[in-house]
Amino acid sequence: MVERDDYAAIRDRIIGLSHTHGLRCDWAETTKRQRFLLLWDAEGRVAARAIVPLYPGETPHLVDSLERGLAHLFGDDWLEDP
């Protein structure tokens, strides 16, 4: 299982799954506490938008929201290791 309170582990999981699904990640610093993520498909369309908390241990509700928000691309339990 990916550590739900570890930003780097969550980020790496998103990047790995994105490559597997043929998506490109664009990251932007929204605030000092979170990153905005855009996932682009091969045709250049935005497949998903998400907020990724930099300190997920402090904001577990944002991790839950992130997991739900990307489930349509990666599956319901995408934060679980394969």
Question: Which residues are covered by each model-predicted region?
Answer:
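Basic nucleic-acid-binding interfaces
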Residues: 1-29, 38-82
